[in-house]
Amino acid sequence: EDGKPIEDVTLKEVHIIKVGVKAKAFDAANIFINHFAELERIEKKRIQKEQALLKATKKKFDTQQKKSTLLSSGLQFLVTEKGTGEKLKENSKVLINYTVYFEDGKLLQTSKLEVAKILDAVDEERKANNNYQPIRADLSANAKMITGFKEGLQQLSVGDKATLFIPFYLAYGETGNAIIPPKSNLIFEVEILELTK
């Protein structure tokens, strides 16, 4: 090809010649160092905020768990705000908001965009697809749902807000799944919005 060297060319050295007052005053090395120092400071601040949120969330759940009701299955639940609606039954179908955490207070998933924003955990793709929405839960015997979640919801009434402490054997068991490690105890915050058909 025209203009292309026959043999590969290797660049061994670059000399930058500063021309003009502004160019001579420009301290690239210092700007480069300061840029990365600022990125490091921002990351450190983000980690501190995340750890403070994690600690506060864990403390809240530890306090709630001490006040919770323990069922014979090992499930614990605490109604944090009592609703005035109908008690849920085994075959109820309900619309709920939920937020699920790992036992250490780390967020796993939520149906509420405002919770994801507070916890700095917004999934932009999920947001773009308008998937931060309440979910429909079928409490019938054959419904596909983790046992502890179903049992916990059956303790509640429409309008209730509650925290469910679900031991691993009533959740995803000894094997876990793609995003939940084996033997993970889970904590759900739920709000029963309404009965559905």
Report residues per predicted region.
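Cross-family detector of peptidyl-prolyl cis-trans isomerase
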Residues: 1-197
